[in-house]
């Protein structure tokens, strides 16, 4: 069985718009042809990013010239995907899979696939790969790379297994994605899971096994069960997100960037990115590079990605916040960047750091020990320059420098490190070492003592006491959302920010409740000694609340450093010792839910990418 007549009429594909039309036609079907679409994308990517030299010895291969926007008057060449080329690749893949898998040997009770059948398909893909190649190299994620070069990266193997299953008519086998790994789900309602590829640098073979162990150990790699369970349209979105436009370390293909951007907007308009937070972040990054007229701005898309993670994945995804923080960092929005990084750490604090979580560790390590220190260093330089030459700086530059005078920025920095420390607690692998401590001290030193002292750090005991007050719940809710600026008695409460902040445990902008009243009194009135008439007397005035944000630490290490962090002078030796020391408290073992709990709870909601 080859390409359908309706598919053939769309060829040849001579431009980006032709490829978009093919994808639109496939997305209009119940079952988009993953093999066809992956072959087309791989073909285009190969000749736009891998081999940009126009070959003269391949008679079937031609390139379509078109005007280039830069430089004016120049030409750009698009590889023409002729039907004969794509059909031959398609026939080769389907023949290879159908010739190697005898479906009669694997009965499908109830029309669903068995683990043995899924394992067999993965064996076919696995055994067809070259024995030795660099598995992290670029441009080996598509079926075009598999057919023409017998090379695939880790996620490419998982996608190839799903594509092969579709070619065999196994419609219950779908792609499952965390933020750094891929496997498959199958069976009734997609309840079964199976590893089909490797992860990381090693080639440890766990194919055929479930992912339940990874879910139970609360590793980030498996997202505690809050991973994406793709349908066919989301699998198309995955292959679009996997497009790699890089020609080399310093150059991207503009044609591939445009193709990826247009395809993502097509998927967005059809509603297929609603449950795909990282695809929304990817699209936002592309819009930042080249805005599309009449489309949502990047900031809106970043927040849509965060909202998707909150709605469908229990707010347990890291990268939606990383995308947002990166945007603010590039635009030198220091306060917003620190808040987004703090939100990221608040998500990671509920995970255990395991040996296969190296990728997210490297992300946090770079943020803590490179990006934040340099951002604060630049802000300090601008602040110093502004003090020496007032009035000469732009408003944005002044805002960046003033971040070091904002206690909320300092509170976000503390919340970021608190999340990292909490992540380490109870984990089988330590996170923090002296390198972290050195840059923590450096970042703390960017804030003057009087700024740091405006942050009020409270203990859980104080929270419990406030629970007795009539307004204690509101205050506690604000604390769970992270640092907040308290309203002064003589000022009206600040307006609430748009609902773009992180939810429980991370946001900002909650306002404190009314001042406390002594028990048994009502503001503005006092009962006379005989209990008769009431006389208007001033109510007892409570001491004004602190001006700065209020913060509750979750980690034992940060609780132990509470006084050191807000001291007038920074005791770097004590902070380094405390941060790198093993926790002195006996951590309670977290009750691990059974793997089925995660699976079933997720299926009641139903729903990235790499």
UniProtKB/Swiss-Prot annotation:
Changing residue 305 to D: Found in isolated hyperparathyroidism; likely pathogenic. GO terms for molecular function: chromatin binding; double-stranded DNA binding; four-way junction DNA binding; phosphoprotein binding; protein-macromolecule adaptor activity; R-SMAD binding; transcription cis-regulatory region binding; Y-form DNA binding. Changing residue 366 to A: Reduced interaction with KMT2A. Changing residue 447 to S: In MEN1; sporadic; with Zollinger-Ellison syndrome. The modification Phosphothreonine is found at residue 594. Its main location: nucleus. Residues 214-390 are annotated as: Interaction with FANCD2. GO terms for biological process: DNA damage response; DNA repair; MAPK cascade; negative regulation of cell cycle; negative regulation of cell population proliferation; negative regulation of cyclin-dependent protein serine/threonine kinase activity; negative regulation of DNA-binding transcription factor activity; negative regulation of DNA-templated transcription. The modification Phosphoserine is found at residues 487, 543. This is Menin. The lineage of its organism: Eukaryota, Metazoa, Chordata, Craniata, Vertebrata.
